[in-house]
Amino acid sequence: MSGGAALPVSQMELHKVNEVQFEIFKERQIKSYAVCLVEHAKSYANAADQSGEASMICVWVPLTSNSACETCHRKHPECPGHFGYIELAEPVFNIGVFDLVLLVLKCVCKTCGALLLNTREQDVHKKLQHMTGLNRLRQVAKMAEAKCRVSTSTEDDMGIDGFDSAPFNGGSGMGPGATRGCGASQPRVSRFYGIYPTLVIKAVHEEQDAEWHADKVRQVLDRVSDDDARLMGFDPQRCHPRDLVLTVLPVPPPQVRPAISFGGLRSDDELTHQIMSIVKRNNQLRRDKESDVQAAIDRSRALLQEHVATYFNNASTYYKPTKVNDTKKLKSLTERLKGKYGRLRGNLMGKRVDFSARTVITGDPNIDVDEVGVPFSVAMTLTFPERVNTINKKRLTEFARRTVYPSANYIHHPNGTITKLALLRDRSKVTLNIGDVVERHVINGDVVLFNRQPTLHRMSMMGHRVRVLNYNTFRLNLSCTTPYNADFDGDEMNLHVPQSLLTKAELIEMMMVPKNFVSPNKSAPCMGIVQDSLLGSYRLTDKDTFLDKYFVQSVALWLDLWQLPIPAILKPRPLWTGKQVFSLILPEVNHPATPQDRPPFPHNDSVVMIRRGQLLCGPITKSIVGAAPGSLIHVIFNEHGSDEVARFINGVQRVTTFFLLNFGFSVGVQDTVADSDTLRQMNDVLVKTRRNVEKIGAAANNRTLNRKAGMTLLQSFEADVNSALNKCREEAAKKALSNVRRTNSFKVMIEAGSKGTDLNICQIAVFVGQQNVAGSRIPFGFRRRTLPHFMLDDYGETSRGMANRGYVEGLKPHEFFFHTMAGREGLIDTAVKTSDTGYLQRKLIKALEDVHAAYDGTVRNANDELIQFMYGEDGLDGARIEGGQLFPLPFRDDKEMEDTYKYEYDVDGTFSGKVGGNYMDPHVRKMLRADPQNVRKLQEEYEQLTADREWSRKMLDLEDRDKLKLNLPVNPGRLIQNARSTMGKRSQVSNLSPITIIDHVRKLQEDLMKLFPSYHRGGDGYIRNTLSRERIESALTLFNVHLRQLLASKRVLKEYKLNDRAFEYLLKEIRTKYHQSLTTPGENIGAIAAQSCGEPATQMTLNTFHNAGISSKNVTLGVPRLLELLNVSRNQKHASMTVSLFPPYDEKRNAQKAQHLIEYCTLESITRRIQFIYDPDPRHTVVEADRDILELEWNVMDESDAELRIQEVVAGSPWVVRLELDVDMVTDKALDMKDVKQAILRVDESYIIETGMANNVRQRTIRMRSRYNEGADSIPKLKREIPALLARVHLRGIPGVRRALLKDTTEFTVDQATGKMSGNKIWAIDTDGTALRRAFIGVVGEDGKNIINAVKTSSNKVPEVCSLLGIEAARSKMLTELREAYLAYGLNINYRHYTILVDTICQHGYLMAVSRSGINRSDTSGPLMRCSFEETVKVLMAAASFGECDPVRGVSANLVLGNQARVGTGLFDLVLNMAALQQAVPQAEAVAPGKDVNVYHSLGSTLQQNIQSSIAYRPRDHDATPFVNNASLFLRQGFGGGSSSAPVTASAPYNPSTTYHGGRLEASAVHRSQAYSTSPALEYGGREASASQMYSVMSSASAFNPVSTRMSSVAHSYSEYSEASSYHLQHSVAPTSMQASLPRTDNSMTMQGIGSVSVPYTPHAMSSAAPPSQVYASTEVGRSHSEDSRSQSALYVPTLSPTHAGYAIRGDEPSTHRSDSNVMWREAGGGREQDEEDDLSTNYMPTAKTPQQAAPPTAAEFGDEEEEEQ
């Protein structure tokens, strides 16, 4: 949130950080930055006593509030702190970059430091071409290890340290192919896992490994050349590999490790003690080296290395943690940086704030929906800083002098002093001066920010108006609880008071509750009427509700109405219906809707019908006024705006609360008791269900139960029983609700939708029903039973969780136990999923935080890399989408098409005489027949509609005629109804011509294209760039098709009967609504997408349910499935394929055959039992059951063959392996025993198959024995080998497909004769397990042809799809799987949010995981963003090691450095022409009587003396034209670069609210509501509107940003809330100090305006099609506007297309006196048209006319304009 300059700020000079360069300090840099060498460990006490050691004191001694630094002589907190350094006795390893040192040593020669690669090879540079930093180093190490070969040599060839120095061929040695190097053999390098970090070189011929310490490693790294370092990814100027080893250790100043004061005692920080230990160990090592005792040196070196390592990271696995005392561990530098409470996330990314309050919330239906009740104690503690001026001086003086609320707490004077009013004895004498800042109490009407944690989405933090109330809790309107996810059971919420006018303006224009009624997540309202008010609405609008005059008059007072409707009943006394009272609240809307689950019988008052704001019939229920898409809330928001929705909600709550207070509502015991008839029906349902369960059990016992695909008999039984019991509960619930009397309080609440369902009535009054755990009945948990009270193996409904009693009667003990088991599951799930979903949301936010809508209509990230050509593929705002629009066009057959769209023609092709006879005006019919070309135009219309039908049949996902509903920005159907009811006349014929309709619809479609932003639009509005034109046409395709079929000429004339006035109104409304729906440039759509996908995840469960019923495929659901997708997991828990089949295998019978062909089958899967039998003589087998089989086998063979077989068997092993196969499985899979035998022999030929040849026996048995007699070892070997052999014998199917299940789908076909489309059921196969590559190869069917249709076969394993089909197929599959994961829980999220997430994941051509392995490995994000996510120290170390530079363009990077993020209002910069302000005069002179009118703009404490602006008016007579000083305003978008400026001027209109005194212009006492004027309008693309606004005071230039593209100007807020008379003048310039802008390309330019420049108003002003570098701001103020126009006029910052010629600044009609003041665009270098494919390809320069060319306005013209506005 932006801060203001109302309170004193630091006087330190501030500069914006444009980039951050990371590097590792070299030894000389550390010494140069340090102020002293630290050689002795000084404690706090004795360091302060040192004399003459000022530098040592500033390193060791922390500053107090009264002391000054001995080095810079500054006091706290101005002293930044000063470093010292420790000269290490020996180099030591930096534990943070230890792994990098190991990688470097793998890349270079250990003798000479040369790179172990031939850099002349093309392959080396090709592999490293697109790699940087750590990835490059890893690749080099991998290539070096692959090439490196160790050669053997004699002992005479040993090199340094006894290592082999024979030449290394192919590397950098002297052998063949080598280019340079010493030729030494390269030992292997590995880490030594000892008591301290050491690199170990494993020599070739030595038994023991040699240990290299840091000093030797430093010598090797010192020999690495700069070129080799660059090839490895280093920047030698910033970090050479030698710098990875420490020789000098910097000592941070005390500001990093402040002392702790407690009770008058001071204690040094833990880091200070650790530094002292390092100094001591370093001195000890230096002494030991002088004594030259190796054991002592090794010990001291190890201790020094350990202390330095734990100083950096005390959580390393190398060492035991260093402890401060017996229990507390040292908090090292790493621990202070990383984690949730570290410096990055705890103090930079987020921090504690002042001016905030927190307490418990309670509900209050009597405050407005956008209000919050604030306790007096909070209102008196929190303050708002208000600057004193001539208008508010009296009011603020009263505040300052009061001692009771409302009062003030502090006064800030311009000289920096602060007066605390509570300390003054006599506050009645307090005086205020102009310029003082008074911190007054929060009062009614102040705007505050209200928040409930966790802040899961944008609507968890909204703006409210303050209502100060008694008691000590925050009061919240009940309708606001839904977006906050709040209730009143003890929830606490946070309140923040803005501290500047700019912050206040942002709250008012962007974050207030009415602005957020519709959520972009589901494109539906997130607030509505709830609970008591919903119940009251239902009862109030009941058909039996009649109200007397007293009540209706009271309601009128609640609603501030002064005229009552005519009563519905006059005699015997006047009575009004509740519907009439409810209609008093309704705005003028049309809303036909039918509540769900209700038969549409109008006589039963079940159909809700609202016409022109009158409720004609039907009760108001949740589906009508709740937070549902298409509800009354949604319709009012779209047609009348957010303020009208707030008024409607407030009115409903006041009226219904008053109604319930008078009529009452309660629930008693009688509402819970069912009558005897209901109990009898419920008992019948239970008896019926019990018999059904017994029937299923009997079928299972008899093994006649139909087994479901892929299920065992027991699983099928459980699925059937559970399904029957659940149906029993549903049936009982429906009967219970229907049997309850109409006045039952429970039934009233259920039907109103305020609380409860029919299931609740059933459970209270009748029975609770089946209790499930993990989607199944209560499992056995106590020795084959659920509880000890039941029999063993009891599968009945009572023992497995069925509760046959209700809550009123009371549950039995075992039923209560089962009920608690089911409830516990939900509690555990809620507790476990909280952390998982929170972490998931954080990862999504980090991955998408930089994605925003750019000014050219594209979606880009912080580096301006393209994510999407158009946001959501249509460029529309998710909050403006309306769903549920029926689209019947694809389902119309030829006859319907002709009846609906085609006109009647004669045989010769001319119009029939009957054409339009009953729906077309006779003059129109005559005109049509007069021109033969009209027939052709109407035929072309019909041909286009036919083509649209074919397109929609191909492109749309067709299910059912009633289910195909479109999500579009405009609901033309409702607009047509509005046009008919408001603009149309009751007539049977229309005066419109079909040709006129066709032309106007075509013109409308062309106009819609002009609404989209593009850099390549010519003066005629045509887009010359092919790519830009195609993306806009693609975005409009579906809407245009829907528009053409709705506004077909015949439908308009015959069905709607619209006249010309109504049709014109309809087209205008469609165009306006569509324009309002366009996305605002700068919108942080990435964060919105992350919130939209993350917040609903909290509603998911973490369990993986087994789908009971039709399918038995195990699927991963909920959060685990989301984590699999977003982490791009390659090991999915339940991977599966959907296999499409070619005809005729897509029929059910043949699909079953395909199922067996695809399912992977091994011999193990069909084997029931394995026996090992000693049976040496097969002629006299000991297995009696096998004798007939053996005889049959031998009888089939010839006698000689049989004898040879017997001899072969006898010669083999005497042990027989007997395999009993599952007969059913062999039959189902159509396995031939000969094929089984061949499969066994293919795997292992060492076995003899005795049986298995015959298929015509009931028992399928295979006897096999080894060919070799191994005696006593046979049995152990067989038991070991046979199970493995069975698993390896592949009989059939695709490896990896564990199960194959049938699945029916619908395929739509078109009858070419009639054009009718019908759906046919076809069968496909779902698999458990995936093998997509093998499925693409195919499976051969019985006819020898492939049965798998690979084109339509897919896998739910996204990485597998990516590896086989590429990134586009993976993107499509990821999108589908994400949507299915949410839809499984009924969560329908807007499509555009999925696309943003998926396109970001697939942006670079590979799947980027939304985790640390993806986000932190991406090259697109800077080090600051990555370290603020995870692995803080690791990322910073790598960034410093490789010299990375962060351009500070992302949200996180700017947040860390305190800059404005480049999204929203920060996406462009304001640049002020300082030279034009030199003639300005100070504020005191500007407001002095008799002076020229001047306005002073406060720009913060550092610029107040330097920047002033002035516009002086010197009128000569009444009609004279005032002139404007050369005060120029630059605006440019922070996108491109360069500056190509030319002045643009416009005349300033005379304002009649000013008066003349002595020839000078002065301001009269004008009320603040009159400080708004109609300005010249800029005609652009067919749009023109007033957009000038008074732009008065800018507070804090360093924090100033132009208000968002959807918000009114800061001047609006300031003039309304500060009431500064000196700012209610006629013209001003908006200066600012933000000149530092981001790097730009050479093709953008800076536009310069002089004086007052007027711009067009658009609902989303930034969405104009224009280059981002050309932005104007209005600075003109004039006469009064109405309240509506004031809410729209603003500091609009639209953009203008450079190729759109002839933009004229002119006044609203009929005021043409300013039409000559034009801003003309011309192309630099001529007027040539451009058709390049790139953006921003040409510079453009504006030309402007001088102010003298504009004619002065007249008083009459102003009067005309006022009349028009009124």
Swiss-Prot record:
The principal location of this protein is nucleus
Molecular function GO terms recorded: DNA binding; DNA-directed RNA polymerase activity; metal ion binding
For this protein, the Enzyme Commission number is 2.7.7.6
Q: Show the ranges annotated as biased composition (Low complexity).
A: 1742-1756
Q: Which UniProt keywords apply?
A: DNA-binding, DNA-directed RNA polymerase, Magnesium, Metal-binding, Nucleotidyltransferase, Nucleus, Transcription, Transferase, Zinc
On the tree of life, the source organism's domain of life is Eukaryota
Q: Which residues does Mg(2+) 1 bind?
A: 487, 489, 491
| Entry binding sites for Zn(2+) | 69, 72, 79, 82
Instruction: Spell out the residue ranges making up region: Disordered.
Output: 1660-1766
- Composition bias (Basic and acidic residues) maps to 1706-1716
Q: Which SUPFAM superfamilies match?
A: beta and beta-prime subunits of DNA dependent RNA-polymerase
Q: Name one GO cellular component term.
A: plastid
The EC category is transferase
Q: Which residues bind Mg(2+) 2?
A: 487, 489
Mention any additional remark: The binding of ribonucleoside triphosphate to the RNA polymerase II transcribing complex probably involves a two-step mechanism. The initial binding seems to occur at the entry (E) site and involves a magnesium ion temporarily coordinated by three conserved aspartate residues of the two largest RNA Pol II subunits. The ribonucleoside triphosphate is transferred by a rotation to the nucleotide addition (A) site for pairing with the template DNA. The catalytic A site involves three conserved aspartate residues of the RNA Pol II largest subunit which permanently coordinate a second magnesium ion.
Q: How does it assemble?
A: Component of the RNA polymerase II (Pol II) complex consisting of 12 subunits.
Protein name stated in the entry: DNA-directed RNA polymerase II subunit RPB1-B
Which gene is transcribed and translated to give this protein? TRP5.9
